[in-house]
Amino acid sequence: MSIRSLGYLRIEATDMAAWREYGLKVLGMVEGKGAPEGALYLRMDDFPARLVVVPGEHDRLLEAGWECANAEGLQEIRNRLDLEGTPYKEATAAELADRRVDEMIRFADPSGNCLEVFHGTALEHRRVVSPYGHRFVTGEQGMGHVVLSTRDDAEALHFYRDVLGFRLRDSMRLPPQMVGRPADGPPAWLRFFGCNPRHHSLAFLPMPTSSGIVHLMVEVEQADDVGLCLDRALRRKVPMSATLGRHVNDLMLSFYMKTPGGFDIEFGCEGRQVDDRDWIARESTAVSLWGHDFTVGARG
C-alpha cells in the first residue's frame, strides 16, 4: 500500500505550559525545533517531531500526518482521491518547510478530520535520549496509533480501506446506545486498520469528541518503562482513564491517561506485529485480556 505509517500528529492547545510539562516530564519525549512562535515540537526518534503542539483557542486535533515511501506512493494517493472525488490541496512552501518534507497534500476525511500525506522527511541525526532512559518503538511502525472520531462507521470504513488503502485488521461491535443510536438500531463498529507490521496504526470510533481524537498510543520497549511512566503520571496527579491491562487484539500492555487537551494517551509496550500474508481479520468480543478498567476515568 502507499501509506506506510503514522508520521506525526499536530494538535492545537490552550495550555502550552501544561503540555510542555506533560510531554517532557511525563511522556519523556525530547524537545525539538520549529518555526511557529510558541509551538512545542516533541521528538521520539530521528523525525524532526512526532507530536507538534500549537497554541490556540481550542484543544483539538489539527492534522494527522501519514507517510508514504516515495513520490510514487503519494501520487497513487492523489489518483485514488481523484477517483473518489475527494478534493485535496498541495502543501505550501511554508508548510513543507515546517513539516520538513519533500511533498505533501492535505485533505479531509468524510468526518472532517484533516489528514496530511507526505514523503521525503528530512531526518534529524542527533540521537534522541529520553531523560528517563526509555526508547520509543517507531521505525517502520511509525509514531504509534491514533483513534479518530467519525460520524459514520460505514462511511469511514469505505474511505480508509477502499480509498486510502488501509488494511482492516480487526473489528469490535459496540452497543448502538453507546453512540446515541436506539437500542434496537444497528451496532456501531470500532475498526482497526494497519499499514505496516504494527497491529493497527489507525482506528475510528463512531462517536463525536470535542477534540476529534479519542486517543493516541505511543509504545516503548520494556514493561518497566511503562511502569515508570505510570509512576511519573501518578506523582504529577495526571488523571487516569484506564488501569494497567493487556488488550486482546494487539496484545499491548498499557495504561491510559488524560492529556492536557482532554483526550487520552495510551502508553504501552509489547504490541503485536502482524504479517498480512497470513493475518486473518476477525471480530474481537472483549477489550482486554485483563485490566484496563475504564471506570477509573469516570470516577476521576
From Swiss-Prot:
GO terms for molecular function: 3,4-dihydroxy-9,10-secoandrosta-1,3,5(10)-triene-9,17-dione 4,5-dioxygenase activity; ferrous iron binding; iron ion binding. It catalyses: 3,4-dihydroxy-9,10-secoandrosta-1,3,5(10)-triene-9,17-dione + O2 = (1E,2Z)-3-hydroxy-5,9,17-trioxo-4,5:9,10-disecoandrosta-1(10),2-dien-4-oate + H(+). Fe cation binds at residues 145, 215, 266. Substrate binds at residues 200, 215, 250, 256. Its cofactor is Fe(2+). Pfam families: BphC_D1, Glyoxalase. Residues 5-120, 142-270 form the VOC domain. Keywords: Aromatic hydrocarbons catabolism, Cholesterol metabolism, Dioxygenase, Iron, Lipid degradation, Lipid metabolism, Metal-binding, Oxidoreductase, Repeat, Steroid metabolism, Sterol metabolism. Induction: Induced by KstR. Its EC number is 1.13.11.25. Catalyzes the meta-cleavage of 3,4-dihydroxy-9,10-seconandrost-1,3,5(10)-triene-9,17-dione (3,4-DHSA) to produce 4,5-9,10-diseco-3-hydroxy-5,9,17-trioxoandrosta-1(10),2-diene-4-oic acid (4,9-DSHA). Belongs to the extradiol ring-cleavage dioxygenase family. This is Iron-dependent extradiol dioxygenase. It comes from Mycobacterium tuberculosis (strain ATCC 25618 / H37Rv).
